[in-house]
Amino acid sequence: MVMTDPIADLLTRIRNANVVRHGVVELPSSKIKKAMANILLQEGYLKDIEEYNDGVVPMLRLSMKYGKGKERIVTGLKRISKPGLRVYCRKEEIPKVLNGLGIAIISTSKGIVTDKEARKLGLGGEVLCYVW
């Protein structure tokens, strides 16, 4: 089966695991998924990332992070720019998610960065998703 939107697949797997409070999510690896997972790790939404090869395709194993009593750390994920409707922003238009409580993940000419890093670098780009 051909996957038309691997970023939406990543977000959906994380969202579904979060809802049922699974400890680990496994998915096929790619550069963009790895970069997004690293951002989620740096921002404190994931506990750990592991890359392994199952013999057929490289895989990512994401360890979910929960608070006390399995309280969810990730309360929401939303795909913004989709294959059918790309959403771009200039450096002046970089969105703030929940007035700074969440993050926007943006694909720029310097790679995939958070909204805060994009503002610091003075770069715009494609708004991939919001996480809060």
Curated annotation (Swiss-Prot):
Keyword Chloroplast in annotation: no
Protein's name according to its UniProt entry: Small ribosomal subunit protein uS8
Organism phylogeny: Bacteria, Bacillati, Bacillota, Clostridia, Eubacteriales
InterPro entries membership: Ribosomal_uS8, Ribosomal_uS8_CS, Ribosomal_uS8_sf
Top-level taxonomic group: Bacteria
Alphabetically ordered keywords of this record: Ribonucleoprotein, Ribosomal protein, RNA-binding, rRNA-binding
Species the sequence originates in: Clostridium acetobutylicum (strain ATCC 824 / DSM 792 / JCM 1419 / IAM 19013 / LMG 5710 / NBRC 13948 / NRRL B-527 / VKM B-1787 / 2291 / W)
UniProt KW Magnesium keyword: no
GO terms under cellular component: ribonucleoprotein complex; ribosome
Family classification: Belongs to the universal ribosomal protein uS8 family.
Subunit structure and binding partners: Part of the 30S ribosomal subunit. Contacts proteins S5 and S12.
